[in-house]
């Protein structure tokens, strides 16, 4: 049985690319990659360790496949599960909503007893939104801006 489930949603391919890079770094011998559009509650519950890739769309909206899965996600008890987050956004064109969807998923996980690990420094990012912040110095997970800072993705 694989130990880590990597779940992502992606419309443009940026979050998928990041998920594939993470999967490759961790290794396919201990991790499994899932597109959120093709998963069930059982898929989530079969892992004790999860990495979730959540892009933000337009005006702070959650990506459509994550939005479809959200009612199921809200019913999962994440007690005894460790979760790390990463998200893609556009800090130039959508600075007022930068990675907001990551913050929305973070709140659901926190409410449902997840042990959330990882954070990412806010330095070198230009944004106005605070939904994805753990505190003033850190985001709730890794944030990526493939359009403005593609060199940071790898």
From Swiss-Prot:
It holds the Pfam family Flavodoxin_1. SUPFAM superfamilies: Flavoproteins. The keyword Electron transport applies. One of its GO terms (molecular function) is electron transfer activity. Keywords: Electron transport, Flavoprotein, FMN, Transport. Residues 4-154 form the Flavodoxin-like domain. Its cofactor is FMN. It comes from the Bacteria. Coiled coil: none annotated. Low-potential electron donor to a number of redox enzymes. Belongs to the flavodoxin family. This is Flavodoxin. It comes from Buchnera aphidicola subsp. Schizaphis graminum (strain Sg). The gene is fldA.
């Amino acid at each position: 049985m694989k130990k880590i489930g990597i779940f992502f949603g992606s419309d443009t391919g940026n979050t998928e690319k990041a998920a594939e890079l993470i999967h490759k770094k961790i290794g396919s011998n201990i991790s499994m990659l899932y597109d959120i559009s093709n998963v069930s509650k059982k898929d989530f519950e079969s892992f004790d360790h999860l990495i979730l890739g959540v892009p933000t769309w337009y005006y702070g909206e959650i990506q459509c496949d994550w939005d479809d899965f959200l009612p199921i996600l809200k019913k999962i008890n994440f007690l005894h599960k460790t979760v790390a987050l990463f998200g893609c956004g556009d800090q130039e064109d959508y600075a007022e909503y930068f990675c907001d969807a990551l913050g929305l998923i973070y709140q659901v996980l926190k409410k449902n007893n997840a042990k959330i690990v990882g954070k990412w420094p806010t330095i070198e990012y230009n944004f106005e939104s605070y939904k994805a912040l753990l505190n003033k110095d850190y985001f709730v997970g890794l944030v990526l801006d493939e359009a403005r800072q593609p060199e940071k993705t790898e």
